[in-house]
Amino acid sequence: LAWYHGDRGAQRVTGTELLILALLLAIGGGLLWRLAAAPANVAAADAAKPLAGASTPIPDKSIAVLPLTNESGEKDQQYFSDGLSEDLITALSQFAGLKVIGRNSSFQFRDTKLPSASLGQALGVAHLLEGSVRRAGDVVRISAMLVNAADGSTLWSQHYDRPYKDLFALQDDITRSVADALKAKLLDGSGARVQSERPPSGNLEAWNAWSRGRFHDAMINPADARKAIGFYEQAISLDPRYARAYASAAVSWVTLAGTFLSGEEQRQAYVKARAASDEALRLDPDLAAGHAARGLLLQWVDFDWTGAEAEYRRAAELAPADALARFTLARMSATLGHPQQAISMLREALTIDPRNGSAWHWLGWTLAAVGQVEEAEQAARRAVTLTPTSPFIAAGLVIIQIQRGENSAALSAAQQIPADIWRSIALAFALQGGNDRAAADQAVKSLIETSADGSAYQIAEVYGLRRDPDSMFQWLDRAWDTRDTGIGRLLTDPFILRYRDDPRFAAFCKKVGLPAVTDAKAMP
């Protein structure tokens, strides 16, 4: 959303942002992190290079599960091999002291030819789990191998031929073998709860339907979103107590409603999302994905920030090894005016998901919010390296360069962004720091003419940069009228915070339900 992938843009609704956050909130699966993923040819050395001054020792008890190769020869079986890979990630995350890299980062190395040492460095792990899977009728064949990343030596390997009906037992065998090899132990009773993606009945076809739903969720279009919901409903019909499927359905309904629907159809979709979320938590009160889905509804449908924060915090408590849970809570912490706390959480999340371009972007934004602009720019550049095709990520670098006073560099970077609403927004920002006042004025005028409803919050920011508080507060009011998700950035926004002592700032915070107190700094 605004604070996750982009505020508002060319779409008539929250669009990409809502889609990203909604899919982010499928705790333990990471449905659509591929949207923020780097192309496979991004250099591993670039991704592995730490920020200046950062220490990145690789713990011995650390592992990345590379996506199992689909050897069935059928592309429509990709969901099956990916589902098995993700289930292994989830299962290994239940072991205390074992660092398990998230799906977003490890899946970027699908079919990679990079040597194991480069992979280990890029992902920050000492071990790699790789292999292949083939399903032929009622038989599943899996080859798995645990590799020492530093030298490529094999620590454990096994080939399995099992009946399809024994799939869950087979996955458990692999998990136990890897855990034994790494001398890892299951989590204790510290408040965490094993977060299984399997149906409580053990119905394989229900899990299969749920996995298909996740696959279609990744297609990013309304037809596939509806197909995903259909598969989740099929999973529920096969196991009516499948809480995880209800949570996934809730997230998909929010995604569909916020990205592709409007009017009464949108309202009804939100009703269905809320019902599915409630049922997920009724069936399993300790399901992290259920709390995350409820948080999504509270945040971006009800704009209940504190209620959403409580749900995200509970999800993170239940799934402490999940980078996505940490990331979501970190961004909500920043939304509520605690950027220093958010920075710590974002750093923790990045140890588990080091190639997450969006997380690097938000680390940069949040560092800049507390005045650490040099390190913020380094993080923003890392984000651009990892997500080179994202106009939003590129615009984030422009805004940080403006905060550093690098106006020429900011304008040059903005001009390199491909045609997109975020190019227009970046140019509107960058031109304010130059000497061509006519161009600066025209950039704001053009942004208003083309995207007044979709970019009301960004227009308010530009007026803050222009030191025009009257226009800034007028556009903030319009942003609230249109429920612009950019409002979630308010308490970490250096342009808006220039006027934090203006009585209108406290009044606006009260209206939108945010505290008027923040640790962030204003732009001078």
Short names for language-model regions:
Residues I399, L427-R437, I487-P503:
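TPR/TPR-like alpha-solenoid helical repeat scaffolds
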Residues L19-L23:
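Sec-dependent signal peptide hydrophobic core
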Residues L490-P524:
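Terminal, low-structured helical/coil segments at or just beyond the last alpha-helical repeat
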